[in-house]
């Protein structure tokens, strides 16, 4: 059985991954450009879309994705 902290971290990883993809879609940003923005490969973005890969807290791509989502939110306000 997963520990509550581990479950919360997994949920946070899923939320940031989904929010990043949604923001990119709404801003009409291609997978190639998103990959450059968050510092992953285009194949990784494809795996993110298929829910086969989640951004992990504490990694550089996760932090860049958080900034990207914040940027989207400020533009959308």
Describe the role of every protein-language-model region:
Residues 1-77:
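Non-transmembrane "mature" sequence context
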